[in-house]
């Protein structure tokens, strides 16, 4: 179950602590104007102690109290992006041409640059930086949030509907059944090459260009 897999596994809890500490440190710098995150200085200082142990390779599961484990699993802040009536999908792209390219390819694969509008992209980036919902770890050293576990909000659902209404000939009457967001450390392995089961699978990256050194 969640507790055993994520809170009592050394690699998993180390990943959670690292993300939790770095995220709360970022929020505390007030870059995105976040208020009322509901974490105490005592909690933050304990996270810092554990984080430093992880960084100098001296962390042990016994360093972590049962109370701290459960606190790390709690969602402290989850304010969704504001929703507007504007399409979140960038219609400056040649939609008809992109649809034809997808439908004519075998297998059906399509690469789109600048999928979102600049405003939608900015809102989604702020949400991913600040929403304290990334409580699930994976073997590649990354954390995730899921539609049924903190990610469901009006912005995400409108984004799904805007995709369908913009690319009508690709999505037709399909419904969104699952969505997730992953965060990766640049020094970890990340996700192996794979294909998820879906009629149409959409993957997009919102990392700022300046963070991409490739």
Question: What are these language model-derived features?
Answer:
Residues 1-214:
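Fe(II)/2-oxoglutarate oxygenase catalytic core
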């Amino acid at each position: 179950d969640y507790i055993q897999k994520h809170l009592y596994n050394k690699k998993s809890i180390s990943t959670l602590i690292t993300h939790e500490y770095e995220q709360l440190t970022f929020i505390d710098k007030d870059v995105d104007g976040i208020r009322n995150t509901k974490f105490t200085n005592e909690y933050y200082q304990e996270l810092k102690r554990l984080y430093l142990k992880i960084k100098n390779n001296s962390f042990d599961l016994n360093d972590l109290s049962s109370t701290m484990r459960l606190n790390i699993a709690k969602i402290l802040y989850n304010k969704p992006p504001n929703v507007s009536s504007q399409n979140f999908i960038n219609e400056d792209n040649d939609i008809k041409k992109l649809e034809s390219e997808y439908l004519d390819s075998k297998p059906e694969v399509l690469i789109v640059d600048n999928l979102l509008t600049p405003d939608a992209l900015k809102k989604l980036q702020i949400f991913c930086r600040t929403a304290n919902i990334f409580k699930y770890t994976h073997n590649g050293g990354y954390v995730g949030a899921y539609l049924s576990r903190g990610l469901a909000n009006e912005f995400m659902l409108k984004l799904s509907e805007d995709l369908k209404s913009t690319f009508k000939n690709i999505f037709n009457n399909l419904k969104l059944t699952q969505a997730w967001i992953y965060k990766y450390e640049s020094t970890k392995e990340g996700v192996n090459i794979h294909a998820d089961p879906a009629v149409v699978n959409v993957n997009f990256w919102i990392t700022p260009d300046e963070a991409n050194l490739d």
